[in-house]
């Protein structure tokens, strides 16, 4: 909250994209040891500033927090959305690697327009 307030106070929040999270969550239950394993089917990301619609919650997990149950987002969707917020069209960003043209978002990815301000 302090970072967001400081950027807002300085007039920099609209031009700064804040991203917090990871490409996987944790299993909602113990795995029989002291920890919980990775869970790529249900995870949380936080985006603020930089063209993101504030106060928006997008998607939903099942009642256990195990898997996306509503509006699932792939890591490619997240990358496409972040690139869009930075003013880049992910479909136009290609590079040549091992005799193949590749996009930064691989062969998938859609901008999540519902979170764009």
Task: Give short role names for the model-derived ranges.
Residues 1-117:
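Ligand-binding pockets and gating/stacking loops
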């Amino acid at each position: 909250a302090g970072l967001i307030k400081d950027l807002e106070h300085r007039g920099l929040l609209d031009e700064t994209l804040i991203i917090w999270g990871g490409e996987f969550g944790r299993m909602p239950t113990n795995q029989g040891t002291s920890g919980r394993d990775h869970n790529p089917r249900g995870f949380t990301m936080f985006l603020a500033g930089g063209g993101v619609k504030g106060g928006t919650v997008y998607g939903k997990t099942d009642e256990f927090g195990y898997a996306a149950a509503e509006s699932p987002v792939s890591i490619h969707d997240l990358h496409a959305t972040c690139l869009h917020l930075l003013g880049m069209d992910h479909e136009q960003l290609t590079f040549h690697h091992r005799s193949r043209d590749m996009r930064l978002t691989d062969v998938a990815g859609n901008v999540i327009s519902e979170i764009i301000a």
